[in-house]
């Protein structure tokens, strides 16, 4: 819109952007309750909603400057990329399309440049955000600043794990990943920064003959689950948009909104009205949330690679296994944020396969200070997928890395045998450990803490049962129990997620099953009791006062 070859790197484009934003902010810098969203659902380039090079001269020059700063010795760069040495001053091209594909190495160059390109893109965008923030603050504005990112920002696009220091709150737009809505909230939250589900709602899903798949009641139930889960690690949600969207030209976006074109209400309107009432009752208590006892650590080395979708699958399965099945609240920490992780009672590194040295060092520092770390599968590759010897370095002798080539496996954890099944992708791309004394969970002392190491990439086995059993065993070993006592029988597909606040405990309860569930529990913090019928596919919430265990606000029952 403002011209230029590259929105983030062309000096003329950046100058115009800065002038536009400064001019608008100057006019409205004292308006209360106004926030600045610098860009909506950003991609790094002209290739919308994917991470690909733009291919312009500004990008190429910036890419080479970034490489020179990261790798002053070109020999180290050649080694990292498995390429012939290219002397100083020579221009290095950005990655080709084939390098982003799973089997690109069969037809073109390897994909080892991807990790650096992803980091370059993240650093470049973070710098752009930093500069615009400075321009806004120069006007005297103290209004909140954010970036409205969608779920792709937690896959392979621009991530608040990098630009987070330059915004006042992070966001996610929970549109499509309806089976990973808890993950949506957890990955958007960055250490020390508030998070909001800034856009949520229902886009139309149709059958092959162009009939809407969901009924209005289905839509309302899904919206209810999305709104409820926005209170996990977050400060709520905004439905985009709350009224009607009839002037959109996109067929799947026209139906968005709680009102129809004739201004009659959909069932979603009742959800919004009731949610607003509940939020008004609890807002004074939504302060000083205690961090979860368990932190799931991502691998950006794997996520910024050609097999990135497998790392995303591992994260989502880890979240579901821990929170839904093992009933343990968790947080998710990006690899480059591990230094800000704090002191959870357990950190889980799920099926990473590869990991940057800096992340590994930060995890070991956490363990040596008394932390517990669970690792599943080998992590014997660095950020460029070169072999390293991390297991031996921490005392795990006799562990050999082998390609995972089997469908079925068994792993012994104390007196229990955990069965695992691996599909085609796992058999094609993953490594596993062979321990010299059998396939069992290893426990290693490191400083004041402990490392638990499982031989298989458990989170990339089919289903979440294997990971949940492993997690439960480790929880028991370190004396970690769920923050509530469940009196009713556990039910698959039901999430019970408590957050301990300054004066209360907030319970978010979500059903993703086909039958109602009679839920009964005792909260360990307040000794308060919850007893309700959770309808199939719906959500409920309750705020329990710490001092006497009474329910001071509730939704859905």
Give a label for each model feature.
Residues 2-23, 27-166, 182-184:
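Polysaccharide-binding and catalytic clefts of secreted carbohydrate-active enzymes
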Residues 29-35, 72-73, 140-144, 167-168, ...:
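Loop/turn elements at helix/coil->beta-strand transitions in domains of secreted/extracellular proteins
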Residues 150-159, 320-341:
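A short, well-structured beta->alpha microelement
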Residues 9-20, 59, 69, 117-128, ...:
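Soluble or luminal CAZymes and related metallo-dependent hydrolases
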Residues 148, 154-318, 405-417, 430, ...:
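Hydrophobic targeting/anchoring helices
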Residues 219, 350-557:
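A conserved amphipathic helix/loop scaffold
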Residues 171, 342-353:
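Short, well-ordered secondary-structure micro-motifs within conserved domains or adaptor modules
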Residues 42, 201, 243-246, 378-383:
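Short beta-alpha junction loops
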């Amino acid at each position: 819109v403002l011209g230029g070859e590259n929105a983030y790197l062309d000096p003329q484009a950046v100058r115009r952007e800065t002038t536009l934003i400064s001019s608008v902010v100057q006019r409205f810098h004292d308006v209360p309750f106004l926030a600045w969203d610098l860009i909506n659902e950003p991609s790094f380039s002209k290739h919308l909603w994917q991470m690909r090079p733009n291919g312009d001269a500004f990008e190429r020059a910036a890419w080479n400057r970034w490489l020179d700063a990261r790798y002053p010795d070109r020999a180290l760069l050649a080694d990292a990329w498995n390429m012939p040495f290219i002397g100083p001053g020579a221009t290095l091209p950005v990655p080709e399309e084939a390098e982003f594909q799973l089997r690109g190495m069969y037809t073109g160059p390897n994909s080892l440049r991807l990790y650096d390109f992803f980091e370059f893109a993240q650093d470049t965008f973070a710098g752009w955000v930093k500069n615009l923030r400075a321009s806004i603050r120069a006007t005297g504005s103290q209004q909140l600043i954010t970036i409205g990112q969608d779920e792709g920002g937690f896959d392979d696009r621009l991530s608040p794990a990098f630009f987070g220091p330059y915004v006042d709150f992070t966001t996610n737009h929970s549109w499509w990943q309806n089976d990973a809505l808890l993950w949506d909230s957890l990955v958007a939250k960055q250490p020390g920064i508030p998070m909001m589900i800034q856009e949520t709602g229902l886009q139309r899903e149709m059958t092959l003959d162009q009939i809407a798949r969901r009924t209005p009641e289905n839509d309302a139930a899904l919206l209810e689950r999305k709104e409820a889960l926005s209170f996990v690690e977050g400060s709520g949600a905004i439905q985009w948009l709350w009224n009607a969207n009839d002037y959109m030209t996109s067929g799947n976006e026209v139906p968005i909104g709680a009102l129809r074109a004739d201004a009659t209400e959909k069932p979603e309107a009742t959800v919004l009205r009731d949610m607003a009432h509940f939020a008004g009752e609890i807002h004074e208590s939504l302060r000083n949330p205690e961090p979860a006892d368990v932190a799931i650590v991502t691998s950006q080395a794997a996520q910024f690679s050609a097999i990135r979708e497998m790392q995303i699958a591992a994260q989502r399965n880890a979240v579901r296994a821990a929170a839904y099945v093992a009933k343990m609240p968790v947080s998710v920490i990006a690899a480059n944020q591990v230094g800000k992780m704090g002191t959870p009672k357990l950190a889980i590194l799920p099926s990473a396969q590869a990991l940057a040295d800096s992340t590994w060092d930060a995890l070991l520092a956490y363990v040596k200070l008394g932390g517990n770390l669970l690792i599943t599968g080998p992590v014997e590759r660095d950020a460029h997928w070169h072999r390293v010897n991390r297991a031996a370095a921490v005392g795990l002798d006799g562990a050999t890395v082998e390609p995972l080539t089997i469908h079925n496996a068994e792993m012994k954890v104390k007196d229990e045998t955990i069965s695992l099944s691996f599909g085609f992708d796992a058999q094609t791309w993953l490594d596993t450990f062979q321990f010299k004394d059998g396939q069992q969970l290893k426990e290693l002392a490191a400083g004041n803490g402990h490392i638990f190491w499982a031989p298989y990439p458990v989170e990339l086995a089919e289903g979440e049962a294997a990971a949940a059993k492993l997690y439960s065993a480790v929880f028991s070993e370190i004396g970690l129990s769920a923050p509530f006592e469940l009196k009713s029988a556990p039910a698959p597909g039901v999430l019970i997620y408590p957050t301990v606040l300054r004066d209360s405990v907030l319970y978010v309860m979500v059903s993703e099953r086909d039958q109602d569930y009679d839920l009964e529990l005792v909260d360990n913090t307040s000794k308060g009791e919850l007893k309700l019928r959770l309808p199939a596919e719906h959500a409920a919430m309750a705020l329990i006062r710490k001092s006497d265990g009474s329910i001071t606000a509730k939704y859905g029952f």
